[in-house]
Amino acid sequence: MQWEVVIGLEIHTQLSTQSKIFSGSATTFGSEPNTQACLVDLGMPGVLPVLNKEAVRMAVKFGLAVDAEIGQHNVFARKNYFYPDLPKGYQISQMELPIVGKGHLDIPLEDGTVKRVGITRAHLEEDAGKSLHEDFQGMTGIDLNRAGTPLLEIVSEPDMRSAKEAVAYVKAIHAIVRYLGICDGNMAEGSLRCDCNVSIRPKGQVEFGTRCEIKNVNSFRFIEKAINSEIQRQIDLIEDGGKVIQQTRLYDPNTNETRAMRSKEEANDYRYFPDPDLLPVIIEDSFIEETRATLPELPPQKRERFQSQFGLSTYDASVLASSREQADYFEKVVSISGDAKLAANWVMVELGSLLNKQGVEIDQSPVSAEQLGGMLKRITDNTISGKIAKMVFEAMANGEGSADEVIEKRGLKQVTDSGAIESMLDEVLAANAEQVEQYRAADEAKRGKMFGFFVGQAMKASKGKANPQQVNELLKAKLEG
């Protein structure tokens, strides 16, 4: 039987506010346990929550970025459940009236197409604390520094049909929240976490299958692996005559399997009701328009502009627009070099490889956009060849200065003098007289292969400095003359 996969995602983004959503406690990551939790965060009697206006602004900003309805009358509710790191015995969240309603996001796929994924809603809520199991010899420690940190939970429609589509969607959300400056997107620190709802159904069936939720997956790679593992588990289960049970599961990267955590709760299991300590939030038109005015050019618009303005492919434009820092770097390189396609290739391939090797982001690149742009200009004006450029790039990465300084210091300037190149070619052909005779006696097909040998010898003789185009033209004339 052929199966269709149905995936919906819930993404929890920690908002980059200075203080918590309902208290004045700081939100700095990595502080000593329980040093950033006040009486409100601890759920002590007699204290009242006060809503952080900046968290509201950030939620509205996200809603506008995904063409969503803004809930101008939204309400906080208590989500009741017991967990050791939830001091109040309930979490303040939103249920019936969220701050962000229906929207959508267009995501670029690997095959160059773009898919629209619906966004059901996004709501504000407070994060819980953290349970620490490692250092307490059979006991569990509780760190409440994270309790009360503002979260925006973004819920998608079940529109994705493969793990790769799900990863593309998470990457698109990740890019948007970073562009907007509302979340740092650091998945290793838990700033962005993903719950994956996965079900399968026979191809052509309209009704959804029974879904399972994989909780708190915190990397793009693990999202893909967890979903694929769960898909296979469900297929094997049904094809062996079993039945999928609705449940919450955890992904174990060591075994590449999901395992049952608990039965999946429904909304009414949490006994939601409006929080009596918080008034409904009324958002005025003027607040929405003020926030709209602060929106930057976002990845989808930037991707389209890169395609139309620079003639880039959908894939290249998507990669370059995936982070604000990378897009800015690329545009700076283009403005200096004047060649967008060459700039795209160097930023994505050579620079990308260097950054991966050094384990740094583009804003910490050892080669600045000015340096790279200057070097590419020297390729386009034939001062250096593409091969020599790699040596120059490496030298710049090692702190040897600008491209011009490296070229001058190392004597790497490309030879473009036709007379000098001809003289060098005469020496190469004289040293390989036997091969020259074989070339002249060969048919067209064999000549093509042999020609590469002479080009290689010529470039070796010039130490890579001869202009490759001139070498090709002059060599062809000499061999066939």
Swiss-Prot record:
EC main group: ligase
SUPFAM superfamilies to which the protein is assigned, alphabetical: GatB/YqeY motif, Glutamine synthetase/guanido kinase
EC number(s) from the headed UniProt entry: 6.3.5.-
Reaction(s) catalysed (UniProt annotation): L-glutamyl-tRNA(Gln) + L-glutamine + ATP + H2O = L-glutaminyl-tRNA(Gln) + L-glutamate + ADP + phosphate + H(+); L-aspartyl-tRNA(Asn) + L-glutamine + ATP + H2O = L-asparaginyl-tRNA(Asn) + L-glutamate + ADP + phosphate + 2 H(+)
Keywords associated with the record: ATP-binding, Ligase, Nucleotide-binding, Protein biosynthesis
Role summary: Allows the formation of correctly charged Asn-tRNA(Asn) or Gln-tRNA(Gln) through the transamidation of misacylated Asp-tRNA(Asn) or Glu-tRNA(Gln) in organisms which lack either or both of asparaginyl-tRNA or glutaminyl-tRNA synthetases. The reaction takes place in the presence of glutamine and ATP through an activated phospho-Asp-tRNA(Asn) or phospho-Glu-tRNA(Gln).
Name of the protein: Aspartyl/glutamyl-tRNA(Asn/Gln) amidotransferase subunit B
Gene source species: Pseudomonas syringae pv. tomato (strain ATCC BAA-871 / DC3000)
